[in-house]
């Protein structure tokens, strides 16, 4: 697996889609045709026009994000209309495009945070990059690998999500082995998160921890990490928009945790590196913020639990270069 920064992810994925012969599957919380993402969006449209099976799923939260609002209700702003136009254009080209989360009880419940791009048997996932201008500018990454088994599974999972949306339902979290690693998928059931549970279990075993996320940890995980030698990195409230700033202030107040993050670029990467008593290391990397709020509201997520030295060394290098 290779860690790619957001711009490299867009460029490499576009090049792969250009050569796609069978399938392209893209899912993200936010998808918009901005200058920073246009190369990939254009290649996705072209792939559908030449007969490749293309499926794209985006959360309706897109409308809020592109309109400069936390709430996904500005469907008629200029930028929101552009998002609607993008969806119509992709559908006209033959893309199976769907908006996720339209019928949820609240703006938080049932949100789809999962992110992946499957091109034939090439997979981009286990990172947090949203497919729009700000998403590309954030401190973030995606991992790229060629793995047919993973590609097949993610195409299947996207189908499950689409089916669940038709009846406004969710499905249980699942963990499954992938070679020597474990893929963790949260299906959106309220209070159920295999990703959060594994983070708590690993934290209990760890001697020291590097915690990186958009938000401060909350709940059981926060309590465990405070008892360990943990370096916490998450955004300062003044770096965020109004609602996110309120969330950060409230979470830090409740958890009584201070961030070590001193840089000025918005942090959106999400991973934890656990160092065990014997010196071995385990990492979780993906879309989950590791805040219990998301667990309570039932967000859909994906993450990888890994002991692979190559993956962990790439995360450590990313940490040293862009976060510490």
State where each predicted segment sits.
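Charged, low-complexity intrinsically disordered terminal segments
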Residues: 1-96, 102-324
């Amino acid at each position: 697996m290779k860690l790619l920064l957001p711009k490299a992810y867009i460029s490499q994925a576009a090049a792969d889609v250009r050569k796609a012969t069978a399938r392209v599957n893209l899912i993200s919380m936010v998808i918009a045709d901005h200058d920073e993402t246009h190369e990939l969006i254009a290649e996705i449209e072209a792939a559908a026009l030449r007969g490749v099976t293309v499926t794209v799923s985006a959360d309706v939260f897109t409308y809020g994000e592109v309109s400069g609002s936390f709430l996904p209700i500005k469907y008629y702003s200029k930028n929101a209309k552009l998002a609607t136009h993008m969806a119509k254009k992709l559908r006209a080209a033959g893309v199976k495009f769907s908006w996720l989360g339209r019928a949820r009880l609240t703006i938080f419940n049932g949100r789809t945070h999962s992110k992946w791009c499957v091109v034939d048997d090439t997979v981009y996932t286990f990172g947090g990059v949203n497919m729009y201008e700000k998403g590309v500018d954030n401190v973030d990454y995606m991992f790229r690998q060629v793995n047919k088994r993973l590609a097949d599974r993610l195409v299947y999972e996207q189908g499950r999500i689409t089916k669940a949306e038709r009846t406004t339902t969710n499905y249980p979290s699942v963990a499954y082995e992938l070679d020597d690693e474990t893929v963790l998928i949260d299906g959106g059931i309220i209070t159920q998160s295999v990703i959060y549970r594994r983070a708590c279990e690993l934290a209990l075993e760890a001697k020291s921890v590097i915690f990186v996320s958009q938000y401060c940890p909350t709940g059981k995980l926060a309590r465990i990490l405070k008892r360990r030698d943990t370096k916490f990195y998450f955004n300062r409230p003044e770096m965020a928009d109004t609602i996110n700033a309120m969330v950060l202030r409230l979470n830090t107040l409740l958890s009584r945790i201070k961030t070590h993050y001193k840089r000025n670029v918005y942090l959106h990467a999400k991973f934890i590196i656990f160092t065990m008593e014997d010196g071995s290391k385990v990492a979780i990397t993906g879309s989950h913020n590791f805040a219990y709020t998301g667990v309570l509201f039932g967000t859909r997520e994906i993450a990888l639990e890994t002991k692979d030295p190559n993956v962990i060394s790439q995360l450590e290098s990313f940490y040293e270069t862009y976060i510490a």
